[in-house]
Amino acid sequence: MKLHILKSKIHNAIVTSGDLEYEGSITIDNELLEMVDMIPNEKVLVVNNNNGERFETYIIKGAHGSREIQLNGAAARCALVGDEIIIMTFALMDEAEARNYKPMVLIVDKENNPKSRHHVGEQDEPLS
């Protein structure tokens, strides 16, 4: 049996823009993606801390260092510019692997600058 396990998350990101006319997705600064091992086209679950909305979409790579978090298409209706969100990826694992896996968490500040990074259950690695 395979289990859906949290793989990584970007915590407390701020939505910087939205584009209703785009086909769909979430554009994320590539530097942030690399820091938590997320990749373009990967499915994400997004939680809006301001209104409780949860939605799924997929990642588009944004410009490295831009600090961009842009919601596109229908996803742009789920959060406003300035809303705080959590972006999560998941992986399928067998139970033995899942019991030992430690997801990577990247915490960002109000400008989406990386503050710290850690595996769940381990000490923060300060980044600024």
Curated annotation (Swiss-Prot):
Catalyzes the pyruvoyl-dependent decarboxylation of aspartate to produce beta-alanine. NCBIfam families: panD. The modification Pyruvic acid (Ser) is found at S25. It comes from Pelodictyon phaeoclathratiforme (strain DSM 5477 / BU-1). Keywords: Autocatalytic cleavage, Cytoplasm, Decarboxylase, Lyase, Pantothenate biosynthesis, Pyruvate, Schiff base, Zymogen. Its cofactor is pyruvate. Pathway: Cofactor biosynthesis; (R)-pantothenate biosynthesis; beta-alanine from L-aspartate: step 1/1. This is Aspartate 1-decarboxylase. Binds 1 pyruvoyl group covalently per subunit. GO terms for molecular function: aspartate 1-decarboxylase activity. The keyword ATP-binding does not apply.
